[in-house]
């Protein structure tokens, strides 16, 4: 009989274990199902963030690459134009001119020096004329000519009538009023007896 109890107990344990196993599996499955439903949201959010970050990094890196590439292309273009471009044409023309001059009896070195001297002379004359023009303009301003010269040269009643339309009359009138106001202020200042107490009282 004990063996019968033993077999019955063993059978009961197996049945109970088989019942508990599916229950645990269903609980685990339901937990994992709930977690798996929540995780895809987190995973998709993380995936989107990683994707956006990687896209931003890619875009940034690609922009840097394009900038570097453009700079390299520009430098290459400059080097190519320097080698075979406009400067090359100018240098060939210069060489041809110097060869012609040397074949006509002028020394090559002398022709180069003469061209340099001509350019230098032209540059010096231009600088001198610019300086003279600036000096004349400043002298013209200092002497207070300008609009008055125009009026003296014009001399007709129509030209004088145009002063207001040109705005010079208004400007001259404002200047006259400013001069009168300055003179009145100076007269008042001279005639006033200002003491140190008055000055300190104003600024306190």
Swiss-Prot record:
Does the entry annotate any disulfide bonds, and if so which pairs? none
Q: In which tissues is it expressed?
A: Isoform LPII is expressed in both pancreas and intestine. Expression of isoform LPI is restricted to the pancreas. Neither isoform is detected in salivary glands.
- Induction line: Produced in the A cells of the islets of Langerhans in response to a drop in blood sugar concentration.
Residue ranges annotated as propeptide in the record: 84-109, 149-161, 197-204
One example GO MF annotation: hormone activity
Q: Which residues, by range, are in coiled-coil regions?
A: none
Which GO terms are recorded in the biological process aspect for this UniProt protein? Answer: adenylate cyclase-modulating G protein-coupled receptor signaling pathway; negative regulation of apoptotic process; positive regulation of insulin secretion involved in cellular response to glucose stimulus; protein kinase A signaling
Mention any one GO cellular component term assigned to this protein in its UniProt record.
Answer: extracellular space
Record's signal peptide: 1-20
Keyword Nucleotidyltransferase on entry: no
Annotated site residue numbers, Cleavage: 52-53, 83-84, 115-116, 148-149, 163-164
Name its cellular compartments.
Answer: Secreted
Task: PTM Arginine amide: list the residues.
Answer: 145
Enumerate the UniProt keywords alphabetically. Answer: Amidation, Cleavage on pair of basic residues, Hormone, Secreted, Signal
Has UniProt tagged this entry with the keyword Signal?
A: yes
Q: Which family does it belong to?
A: Belongs to the glucagon family.
Protein's UniProt name? Pro-glucagon
Q: Which organism is it from?
A: Heloderma suspectum (Gila monster)
Organism ancestry: Eukaryota, Metazoa, Chordata, Craniata, Vertebrata
């Amino acid at each position: 009989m004990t063996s019968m109890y033993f077999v019955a107990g063993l059978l009961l344990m197996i049945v109970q274990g088989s019942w508990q196993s599916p229950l645990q599996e269903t609980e685990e499955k339901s937990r994992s199902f709930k977690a798996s439903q929540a995780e895809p949201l987190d995973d998709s959010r993380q995936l989107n963030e990683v994707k956006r970050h990687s896209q931003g990094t890619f875009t940034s890196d690609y922009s840097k690459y394009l900038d570097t590439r453009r700079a390299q292309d520009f430098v290459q273009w400059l080097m190519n134009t320097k080698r075979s471009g406009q400067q090359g044409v100018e240098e060939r023309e210069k060489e041809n001119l110097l060869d012609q001059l040397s074949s006509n009896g002028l020394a090559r070195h002398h022709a180069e020096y003469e061209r340099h001297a001509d350019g230098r002379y032209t540059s010096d004359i231009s600088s001198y004329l610019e300086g003279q023009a600036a000096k004349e303009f400043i002298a013209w301003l200092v002497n207070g000519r300008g609009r008055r010269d125009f009026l003296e040269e014009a001399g007709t009643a129509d030209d004088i009538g145009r002063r207001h339309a040109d705005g010079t009359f208004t400007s001259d009138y404002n200047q006259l009023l400013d001069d009168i106001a300055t003179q009145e202020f100076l007269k008042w200042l001279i005639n006033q007896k200002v003491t140190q107490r008055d000055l300190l009282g104003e600024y306190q």
